[in-house]
Amino acid sequence: MLQKKVLIVDDSPAQVKLIEGFLEHEGYRLVGINDPERVEEAIANERPSVILLDVVMPKRNGFQVCRELKNHADYNAIPVILVTSKNTESDRFWGQQQGADGYVTKPFTREELLRAVRRFA
């Protein structure tokens, strides 16, 4: 059976490490990047099963990246889970409007993150 890949996109290396720590013993192949400008390259190279995408990042925020991925014919079927401290109802609504498949609010527990990833990967 092919190992499921999770692409983690967060400008904070510490946050990427935290997420990797939560998922490393769950059988997923983990790919972490800190630059939202490299998302398309990482997807093309890795073909992830699911993307965990931070919202608050420099240059391109997660809402923008999500919208661009969902409008791209080659990438729109890949589930995107937004991972963010933005936790208002309007933030969640805006994420859905951009095409996000899931939403995890920081701080999150290991179980919350696993539940979201398992739903799609």
Predicted regions and their residues:
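The feature encodes the CheY-like receiver
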Residues: 16, 58-59, 88
